[in-house]
């Protein structure tokens, strides 16, 4: 379908769309490397660049030049796909913004090994001379995982990144800030320190902790891209060093209510214990169960504490109670999901980390949008003093 659209576009390119396309290509220099990467993947039957012939795998200048000439038309096809996507995306974003809606986007900390970034910027990653990773990312064994988590992503060479004044990360964040109104940085604690596992290990055993770039990186990002518009996903082991980084960066941190219900009442995730307004409270996230699904899987003692704290008698009341305490908290921003508004359980969960097959399949139906839910959320937003000020329209003279 898109090949057909591209063919028609190529034959009839003219007018405003033609100029838009030229501008898009001129303003996005990353397109050349990305489109060549995609064209070469097609030419190699979808194989990872790690399996390409040595001259291309190592980006020999002559081999890359020849490939650009040979696959010029395929490269243009992939440039067209990007052009169409971003053209439509920015129309959608404008429509949302015009209706008072901001979009929060996620930016992962690491890249996939089989990506244009790693192939084209191999010097920025911990790879050997043959472009094979020396170490990969993950998380060590703990009480929740006997073998730890082996993510497998190549790890940045932070010394080289610093030598280049974090050029790659500045570009990445600048682009993300254009795509979204607010950017949530995934695994923020990994910038403080990271766990490096020898490449080839079958589990996360045998890895080592190393210092990350810490505030040095974010100081440059702030200087080059501006201070606002970022949320730090700081879930995990919060050490004094991580707290220091969060304070230096001054990004809002995350408070997930599902982490809050330690029966002692002392959890830092309980709204009464927030020490700063500079945070975002979540009823649940895309990686967690829904509030109702989470509650149904608790032990009896914790269930009783949750009910007492929220003042509810039945499980069905819990999602609304979660939204209520989130909205009435002192956090600068409060987040909930359609699943919570609809009172759905585990059947509506979006993602189970470290699994494949049935994730990211849940969809909101038109019937889920009810006048009752809208009125409830509107009123709660008003009495919680979370309604944005209404912009006064200028009178025509």
Residue map of PLM features:
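C-terminal accessory segments of extracellular proteins
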Residues: 372-387
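Conserved, well-ordered alpha-helix/loop/beta-strand core segments that scaffold catalytic motifs
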Residues: 78-110
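Alpha-amylase-like alpha-glycosidases and glucanotransferases acting on alpha-linked glucans and related
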Residues: 1-86, 111-335, 339-341, 346, ...
